[in-house]
Amino acid sequence: MLILTRKIGESLLIGDNVEITVLSVRGNQVKLGVNAPKEVSVHREEIYQRIKALADDVASDTQQ
């Protein structure tokens, strides 16, 4: 795992077209801005896990 330190207003790039910017830090909460093309899905981890679980359920239902 790559670990980076960024200050408010600083960014990091993922590939050529995804930019993550630190917008604010308050206590133990960090607010991030994500600038990515529409074809790139961006989700919080817990939402992604729900989407994946629903897709897995649908896939298993169609195989039965």
Swiss-Prot record:
Subcellular compartments: Cytoplasm
GO molecular function term, any single one: mRNA 5'-UTR binding
Keywords linked to the UniProt accession: Activator, Cytoplasm, Repressor, RNA-binding, Translation regulation
Residues annotated as transmembrane: none
Gene Ontology CC entries for this record: cytosol
Source domain of life: Bacteria
Span of the signal peptide: none
InterPro entries: CsrA, CsrA_sf
SUPFAM superfamilies on file: CsrA-like
Keyword Repressor recorded: yes
UniProt GO BP: mRNA catabolic process; negative regulation of translational initiation; positive regulation of translational initiation; regulation of carbohydrate metabolic process
UniProt subunit comment: Homodimer; the beta-strands of each monomer intercalate to form a hydrophobic core, while the alpha-helices form wings that extend away from the core.
Family in the record: Belongs to the CsrA/RsmA family.
Functional summary from the UniProt entry: A key translational regulator that binds mRNA to regulate translation initiation and/or mRNA stability. Mediates global changes in gene expression, shifting from rapid growth to stress survival by linking envelope stress, the stringent response and the catabolite repression systems. Usually binds in the 5'-UTR; binding at or near the Shine-Dalgarno sequence prevents ribosome-binding, repressing translation, binding elsewhere in the 5'-UTR can activate translation and/or stabilize the mRNA. Its function is antagonized by small RNA(s).
NCBIfam families in alphabetical order: csrA (TIGR00202), PRK01712.1 (NF002469)
Name assigned to this protein: Translational regulator CsrA
